[in-house]
Amino acid sequence: MPTISQLIRRGRETVAQKSASPALRECPQKRGVCTRVYTTTPKKPNSALRKVARVRLTNGYEVTTYIPGIGHNLQEHSVVLVRGGRVKDLPGVRYHIVRGALDTAGVQNRNRGRSKYGAKRPKK
């Protein structure tokens, strides 16, 4: 334990916070191009076919991103907007694709939580 005079001379070293989404480089979102669109299976105890895409970002990083919602129109060379946010049961997936932005269509027939899935307000 340092003395008061040692602390005055040197101070305490601050521990740098590690980013949860380093490929975004402090940006809220980044644009990218899909290089591969596929499905993968989650960790135990869950079971499903989760839709994911490999995306090359404008800064050169290549990341694995999750495609949220039911159904999607993405294929190779689709231009997408990527945000942070991991998927707990998919190891290595630390980013989400923003639905309803750029080439990604919003989720069809979605009535609740529409803003999260890029769905327009339904007609009366």
From Swiss-Prot:
<protein>
    <recommendedName>
        <fullName>Small ribosomal subunit protein uS12</fullName>
    </recommendedName>
</protein>
<dbReference type="GO" id="GO:0006412">
    <property type="term" value="P:translation"/>
</dbReference>
<dbReference type="InterPro" id="IPR006032">
    <property type="entry name" value="Ribosomal_uS12"/>
</dbReference>
<dbReference type="InterPro" id="IPR012340">
    <property type="entry name" value="NA-bd_OB-fold"/>
</dbReference>
<comment type="similarity">
    <text>Belongs to the universal ribosomal protein uS12 family.</text>
</comment>
<keyword id="KW-0687">Ribonucleoprotein</keyword>
<comment type="function">
    <text>Interacts with and stabilizes bases of the 16S rRNA that are involved in tRNA selection in the A site and with the mRNA backbone. Located at the interface of the 30S and 50S subunits, it traverses the body of the 30S subunit contacting proteins on the other side and probably holding the rRNA structure together. The combined cluster of proteins S8, S12 and S17 appears to hold together the shoulder and platform of the 30S subunit.</text>
</comment>
<keyword id="KW-0694">RNA-binding</keyword>
<dbReference type="GO" id="GO:0000049">
    <property type="term" value="F:tRNA binding"/>
</dbReference>
<comment type="subunit">
    <text>Part of the 30S ribosomal subunit. Contacts proteins S8 and S17. May interact with IF1 in the 30S initiation complex.</text>
</comment>
<keyword id="KW-0699">rRNA-binding</keyword>
<keyword id="KW-0820">tRNA-binding</keyword>
<dbReference type="InterPro" id="IPR005679">
    <property type="entry name" value="Ribosomal_uS12_bac"/>
</dbReference>
<dbReference type="Pfam" id="PF00164">
    <property type="entry name" value="Ribosom_S12_S23"/>
</dbReference>
<keyword id="KW-0689">Ribosomal protein</keyword>
<dbReference type="GO" id="GO:0019843">
    <property type="term" value="F:rRNA binding"/>
</dbReference>
<dbReference type="GO" id="GO:0003735">
    <property type="term" value="F:structural constituent of ribosome"/>
</dbReference>
<keyword id="KW-0488">Methylation</keyword>
<feature type="modified residue" description="3-methylthioaspartic acid">
    <location>
        <position position="89"/>
    </location>
</feature>
<dbReference type="GO" id="GO:0015935">
    <property type="term" value="C:small ribosomal subunit"/>
</dbReference>
<feature type="compositionally biased region" description="Basic residues">
    <location>
        <begin position="111"/>
        <end position="124"/>
    </location>
</feature>
<feature type="region of interest" description="Disordered">
    <location>
        <begin position="103"/>
        <end position="124"/>
    </location>
</feature>
<comment type="function">
    <text>With S4 and S5 plays an important role in translational accuracy.</text>
</comment>
